[in-house]
Amino acid sequence: MNPPPLIRLQDVTVKIQGRTLIENVTFDINSGEIITVIGPNGAGKSTLAKALLGIQPLSRGEVLRRPGLKIGYMPQRFHIDASLPLTVKRFLQLAHNPQRWREALQRVEMEHVAKQPMHTLSGGELQRVLLARALQRAPDLLVLDEPAQGVDVTGQAELYRLIRSLRDELHCGALLVSHDLHLVMASTDQVLCLNRHICCAGHPEKVSNEPAFINLFGTQAARSLAVYHHHHDHHHHTDGTVAAGSECSHGDQHA
């Protein structure tokens, strides 16, 4: 018998002041599984992550969590005031399980920034430190909201390699949220395209089949990144209504 999923969303709907943010969203996340949620701005991706975490009240549906489930969360936005003398070490010591700060930094390959002020970190360094903080809970599930934000393509490939390695080491599940409609983590088991509801879902295709990409970014990036091709049976009007047909209105990003 297969173990129950780490988390199950059933017909999850969130409405705020009469506006539907997400509607009838249903999917499972299992141990060792990586799911990437993509979609345009305003599609409800962060709302979905908050609903999964239990910090966003539901209008309808339910979120079922495996008993004792531990979740490590990496937020989309994080700002440290430059006037605040907070080092990376101290930042991690303020988190859950502060004694694990050194182990967490080692896992994300960032021991060398332990004494560095938080506000001096580069975009890629900050993302890894936030990932280290999420790891301090020894999570069964990682929820990473825009983990590659502010990171170039080569940095994305390295970050995705690290996430894959952590998944293999910790045997945890992972939900990644991304605004990139096409370029996703190659190790993703399932891509969910969200625009209030799940428009389509499927497996990414490896970019190792794209010689131009390999020539530009190298074979390491090709192993970590993949292209997702959308297959929609409907499209969205600008007022949010849904109509039959494969035309897609995700915007210019979705070429």
UniProtKB/Swiss-Prot annotation:
GO terms for cellular component: plasma membrane. The keyword Nucleotide-binding applies. ATP binds at G39, P40, N41, G42, A43, G44, K45, S46. GO terms for molecular function: ABC-type zinc transporter activity; ATP binding; ATP hydrolysis activity. GO terms for biological process: response to zinc ion. Keywords: ATP-binding, Cell inner membrane, Cell membrane, Ion transport, Membrane, Nucleotide-binding, Translocase, Transport, Zinc, Zinc transport. Residues 7-220 form the ABC transporter domain. It is a peripheral membrane protein. Its main location: membrane. Gene3D superfamilies: P-loop containing nucleotide triphosphate hydrolases. Residues 229-255 are annotated as: Disordered. It is found in: Cell inner membrane. Belongs to the ABC transporter superfamily. Zinc importer (TC 3.A.1.15.5) family. Part of the ABC transporter complex ZnuABC involved in zinc import. Responsible for energy coupling to the transport system. The complex is composed of two ATP-binding proteins (ZnuC), two transmembrane proteins (ZnuB) and a solute-binding protein (ZnuA). This is Zinc import ATP-binding protein ZnuC 1. It comes from Hahella chejuensis (strain KCTC 2396).
